[in-house]
A protein has these predicted regions:
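ATP-grasp fold ATP-binding core
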Residues: 1-10, 33-44
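ATP-dependent carboxylate/phosphate-activation module, predominantly the ATP-grasp catalytic core
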Residues: 12-21, 40-46, 50-106, 135-160
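Structured catalytic cores of enzymes that bind and process phosphorylated ligands/cofactors
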Residues: 29-31
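Short beta-strand or tight-loop elements
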Residues: 34, 45-47, 114-117
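Short, solvent-exposed polar/charged micro-motifs at secondary-structure junctions
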Residues: 5-8, 46-51, 123, 127-128
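ATP-dependent carboxylate activation and anion-phosphoryl transfer catalytic cores
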Residues: 90-209
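A short acidic, often aromatic-flanked loop/helix-cap motif at beta-alpha or helix-coil junctions
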Residues: 2, 22-23
């Protein structure tokens, strides 16, 4: 994947390269661009999580799959800043991988992880996870996660009030009690469903009783 270095999200000007001819064509069309990036084209799932660290301790974390994005067709990558459809996942390997990444960064930087750390990940064709972004804040779906049992918002307030995380329940690999999904669009409240099986029921589409 070639992408112009324009300091914007969404892969503006990006092109998937399948052969050397595509590469040469991109360079010809964008001859006035002094810098560009080359990255692997990842075909797997978009994964994400939210994790809480306190003075180097990994306190709790939970994961999800960002299956579709709001206004995806406006970006060449089909990835925008907000999730439209997501699945909540009970896959421990996601949080384990992210915690390993944080431990690596702690060692390299010589500082302990502290606060909310939110990962964006993408799987390659073999299902191996690659880090695409790490945010040092709550994500937009933090409130939705709270509704389905993973409430970092309440935990954050408790830490601010207590001055420590002694009263925060340790839960490094949170498991949701149901296969929840959520749907969200611009300027509307998110819709939370207990599973996506409803989409497989033809009676729902045709309002058959």
């Amino acid at each position: 994947m070639l992408d112009s270095c324009n300091r914007r999200t969404g892969g503006l000007g990006s092109l998937r390269l399948d052969d050397i001819s595509s590469y040469r064509s991109w360079l010809f069309i964008n001859a006035n661009i002094p810098e560009f990036t080359v990255s692997e084209f990842l075909t797997g799932r978009h994964l994400a999580n939210e994790m809480l660290y306190y003075d180097g301790e990994y306190v709790k974390g939970a994961a999800l799959e960002c299956a579709e994005y709001v206004m995806a067709n406006t970006a060449p990558s089909h990835v925008t800043g907000n999730t439209h459809f997501a699945r909540f996942l009970n896959e421990d390997r996601i949080n384990k991988f992210c915690d390993d990444c944080i431990k690596y960064l702690e060692k390299k930087l010589g500082v302990p992880a502290h606060g909310i750390l939110s990962f964006d990940l993408k799987e390659d064709k073999n299902g191996e996870m690659k880090v695409t972004e790490i945010n040092i804040r709550h994500m937009a779906y933090a409130g939705v996660m709270a509704h389905v049992g993973f409430d970092l918002i309440e935990d954050t307030i408790r830490i601010m009030e207590d001055g420590n995380c002694n009263n925060v329940v340790r839960n490094q690999y949170h498991h949701y009690d149901k296969p929840y999904i959520f749907l969200r669009d611009v300027d509307v409240e998110p819709i939370i469903l207990e599973s996506e099986e409803i989409f497989d029921d033809s009676k729902v589409y045709f309002n058959i009783k």
